[in-house]
Amino acid sequence: MRTKSCFAAVRMFAICTLLSSPALSPAFAAPADVPVRLAGAQTSPAQVYGKLFSSQQEEVVAAAEAMPADKYNFAPTNGTFQGVRTFAQQVTHIASSQYYFFTGFGLKPSVDSDAIDKLTSKDEIVKALKDSYAFAHQAVETITPENAFEQFGEHKNTRAGIAAMGLAHTNDHYGQMVVYLRMNGIIPPASRK
């Protein structure tokens, strides 16, 4: 069901485009004493992001599980392109990045995200990936209509913006994982539907 993935990608692009819109910048923001209301919103931001992360998680975890353990050190033309991540490094980068993005929501991870980058076995890496998605889900569940666009932290980010960036970042690396799978003769699980 390639169409489902295509629509998901288009939906993700639209959300990221909307969230990066100048109309959402502080210069266009409502005064602090005016509550933020999403016109006609029937679904909370937490539900929207939760569904997006669940959909992404399904594809990314399936791709991580599809690569055989003996291919986790594969990198395309490793000798020619110095510094290209291996498949394992793509997956650990996604996992550790989830913690990086969402620790700013005030949640404390139960793992050292730097240690994730040192994992070597497929089983450990896939577990770390799944755990990082649990952490991401926990974070996006805290996004409300009232706090979605509030700026916080040193970099004046918003929860909605961080969640969108987390999704976009992982989609980039998922795309690379798909190429690695195909270079090894493996059809990505999302393309098999």
Tell where the protein language model's regions lie, with residue ranges.
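Bacterial N-terminal signal peptides
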Residues: 11-25
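Short, helix-capping/interhelical loops that line the mouth of catalytic, cofactor-
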Residues: 29-48, 92-155, 184-193
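Solvent-exposed, charged/polar functional surfaces in cytosolic regulatory/catalytic domains
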Residues: 59-62, 66, 135-139, 176
